[in-house]
Amino acid sequence: MLSYQWDHQAQVMRVYDMLTRLGITCWMDVKSGMGADIYEGMANAVSNASVVVCFMSEKYQQSANCMLEVKFAKQSGVGMIPVMMEGSGWRPSGWLGLITAGSLWVRLSDESQFEENIRQLYGQIQGMVGAALAIEEVSDE
C-alpha cells in the first residue's frame, strides 16, 4: 500500500508505475479505488497490505488521514517502509518521528538518484514481503 499526501501524488504515481513494472502489486487510492467511505477504504487497504510505504513530508505529518493510516498499520502489525520526500531541511517529529524511529528510510527527494532509490525501495519491499510470507508458512504448519 502506498500512503501519501496529495501534494506528492505525481511522484508517488511514478513510484507506483515503476514498482508495478517490477512485479510488485501495489494499492494506491487513485489507481485501486477508495470506495464510497474513505475510512473503510483506508482500513481495507491497510488490512490487505503486506507492507505500507509511507511517503513522508511535512504535509504528510500534518495530515489527519495519513496519521490514521500509519497508526492503523502499526497497530495491525503491518510492516512499514518510510520514504523521505523532503530535502534535508525537514525531518519527521511528533507521532511520525516516533513511529518511524529506527527505520531505514528510502530517500526520494533527489531526482538524480530516483531510479537507484527505487531499486532500494524494491529491495526493502521484497525483504519485508518475503519475511511476512515465511512467517505465514511457519504458522500454517
Task: Outline where the language-model segments fall.
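Conserved beta-strand segments of the P-loop GTPase G domain that flank and frequently precede/overlap
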Residues: 3, 29, 54-57, 83-84
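Short glycine-biased active-site loop of nucleotidyltransferases that positions the nucleotide triphosphate
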Residues: 42-46, 95-97
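Conserved TIR/SEFIR loop-to-helix hotspot centered on a Trp-containing motif
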Residues: 34, 58-78, 88-94
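C-terminal interaction surface of TIR/SEFIR-family domains
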Residues: 1-21, 64, 85-141
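Hydrophobic anchor at the start of a short beta-strand
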Residues: 26, 80-81
